[in-house]
Amino acid sequence: MLKVGITGGIGVGKTYISNLLEKMGYPVFYSDIIAKEIVSKDSRLISLIKQEFGDDIYLADNKIDNKLLSSIVFNDNNRLSKLNSLIHPFVFECFNEWCEKQSSRIVFKEAAILFESNSHLNLEKVICITASKNSRIQRIIKRDGRSL
């Protein structure tokens, strides 16, 4: 099975390309979506995150408190790296299990931080999507319903 990564910065069109590939019949693993799911569903990961960031990082319904987490990690690269080091092994595990269930000769893995997480080491090829800064800004504004 050929494993191909899809990566690039925010607003470059990773999801657009991934959706096209899916429409063509190729399986696509969406790393960011899986990461968001498992931080609220995998009890092993929840325990590790609570150990590192405290019980208050989770709300009553086992949903992560994104505002609190953001205030901690996005002002401290060491804490962000620690969070990523906790989450990425679980995403790798999910990807490997997902691959075992695929019958396609080619699968794709979309990940915004493919290289930073060392995910590329488990892939045969990587496609890096790019776009101009202006295009990216316009896409993000449209996608998020924001204005400048």
Predicted regions and their residues:
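Short, high-confidence coil segments that cap the C-terminus of an alpha-helix
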Residues: 1, 103-104
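Hydrophobic anchor at the beta1->P-loop junction of P-loop NTPases
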Residues: 4-6
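P-loop (Walker A) phosphate-binding loop of NTP-binding proteins
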Residues: 9, 21
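ATP-binding Walker
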Residues: 12
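Walker A/P-loop
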Residues: 15
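Post-Walker A helix-loop "phosphate-sensing" segment adjacent to the P-loop in P-loop NTPases
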Residues: 22-31, 43-44
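ATP-dependent small-molecule kinase phosphotransfer cores
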Residues: 33-103
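ATP-dependent NMP and nucleoside kinases share a basic, alpha-helical "lid"
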Residues: 93-101, 107-139
